[in-house]
């Protein structure tokens, strides 16, 4: 089989990962980390969303895209991660921000290449955490963590209809009902709402001594 005009010679999935980053101390107790990455998915094996026939029962000449259980795709993931950390005897402060893109390419039955966002393509993600240790023996620990992320992509539903199983020769449309059919929008063309979460935690340590 071929993908994007190139012969597919192996069933293995392939990817090349490029990454570069740096970490340095801004001032005492304050550390900055910056990291960029690019992942080139040369060959991916995915579930075939376009399958309409079983491979054994498909009419002669049916394209592979309409009869195979799996399909070949390519893709890329790239982005930037930035984190900042401050730490002393009482305080621990940490923040991280990620900017990311994850896209895949697939071919339709006419060998035209299409690009879509994956369902885990989150554009912005941020985490902030603060921890304070109190008490003469550091027995109290109070912490808070906040997470924010933009919504994940999803495939929207365009319409519902009654699907009649005409492949069954005994089906009578006058006396029997069909089942629910769904017409979907473009793949992952929708986006879920943004997500945020705040966790607050209080811990107390107890020390026991032997008499």
Residue ranges with predicted function:
Residues 38-40, 60-153:
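Gram-negative outer-membrane beta-barrel transporters
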Residues 2, 61-64, 110-111, 175, ...:
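General secondary-structure edge motif
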Residues 115-211:
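Conserved C-terminal beta-signal and adjacent last beta-strands/turns
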Residues 1-3, 36, 45-51, 57-59, ...:
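Outer-membrane beta-barrel translocator domains and adjoining extracellular loop/strand segments
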Residues 16, 28, 32, 44-51, ...:
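A generic structural micro-environment signature
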Residues 13, 23-25, 29, 85-89, ...:
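Structural signature of outer-membrane beta-barrel channels/translocons
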Residues 46-48, 56-61, 108, 118-122, ...:
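Glycine-rich loops and low-complexity Gly/Arg-rich segments
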Residues 1-33, 38-41, 52, 58-87, ...:
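Outer-membrane beta-barrel signature, preferentially recognizing the C-terminal barrel domain
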């Amino acid at each position: 089989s071929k993908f994007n005009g190139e012969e597919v010679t192996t069933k293995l999935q392939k990817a090349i990962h490029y990454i570069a980053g740096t970490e340095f101390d801004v001032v005492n107790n304050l550390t900055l980390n910056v990291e960029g990455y690019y992942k080139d998915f040369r060959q991916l094996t995915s579930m075939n969303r376009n399958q309409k026939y079983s491979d054994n029962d498909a009419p002669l000449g049916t394209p592979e895209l309409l009869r195979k259980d799996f399909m070949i795709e390519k893709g890329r993931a790239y982005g930037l991660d930035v984190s900042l950390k401050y730490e002393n005897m009482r305080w621990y402060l940490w923040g991280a921000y990620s900017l990311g893109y994850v896209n895949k390419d697939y071919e339709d039955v006419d060998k035209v290449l299409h690009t879509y966002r994956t369902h885990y393509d989150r554009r912005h993600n941020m985490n902030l955490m603060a921890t304070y240790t109190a008490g003469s023996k550091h027995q109290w620990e109070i912490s808070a963590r906040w997470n924010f992320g933009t919504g994940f992509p999803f495939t929207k539903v365009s319409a519902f209809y009654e699907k009649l199983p005409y492949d069954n020769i005994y089906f009578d449309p006058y006396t029997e009902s069909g089942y629910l059919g769904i017409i979907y929008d473009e793949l992952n063309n929708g986006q879920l709402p943004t997500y945020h979460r705040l966790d607050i935690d209080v811990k107390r340590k107890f020390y026991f001594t032997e008499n």
